[in-house]
UniProtKB/Swiss-Prot annotation:
This is Mitochondrial import inner membrane translocase subunit Tim21. The gene is timm21. Pfam families: TIM21 (PF08294). One of its GO terms (cellular component) is TIM23 mitochondrial import inner membrane translocase complex. Belongs to the TIM21 family.
Amino acid sequence: MLPRFLWRPVLCSYRALGSPSRSLTVSYRNLSCLALLHKGAFAAPTSRSLFCAERPISTGCTSLQVKDKRVSVQSTSDGAPPQNASHKVKEAGRDFTYFIVVLIGIGVTGGLFYVVFEELFSSSSPSKIYGEALEKCRSHPEVIGAFGEPIKGYGETTRRGRRQHVSHMEFVKDGIKCMRLKFYIEGSEPRKQGTVHIEVKENPASGKYEFQYIFVEIDTYPRRTIIIEDNR
């Protein structure tokens, strides 16, 4: 069955023609054309619908391509930027600066370790000489009898009561290095205090310091001097 809106052209063409046979032929022609149109009316929308359906698909593909391009650009921006010559020069300069800082730190640390080692363990350090002289005082019978045990030693005392390092003085005599030290001792005897005087001289053969003299002055009454060692 043809739709109603297609029957009106057929009737109009039939009335316009004079001969029934001619009108019949025209009617058949019109009917065949209308049948073709009828088929095309149902086919055309299908093709048009397919065409319309294809356009969104093609548009969707285009949008997908744009999205892919955007993703690729985004991945490029997120990744490592291309390094040019100036950027490489800046990085090399920065690495060289870090290397210099590390070398300076290592040098300062090595210097500190050297100073500490010389101060504590070297035979020519004042701390080492002070320790050896204090042990001689602790083992001397007269010192033990005068001050009592245990005997402890300390350096100069500040106004705030803090005890500093042992005072010492280095000098050269007849081309030989010498050193004089002074520290204080006290024991279990109340109000008993003594001052220890030391002089050492470097042995040219061994390079070590040797004691020239060690003596203790008792600062309280009765005052006297205890000679522990005298090699002059």
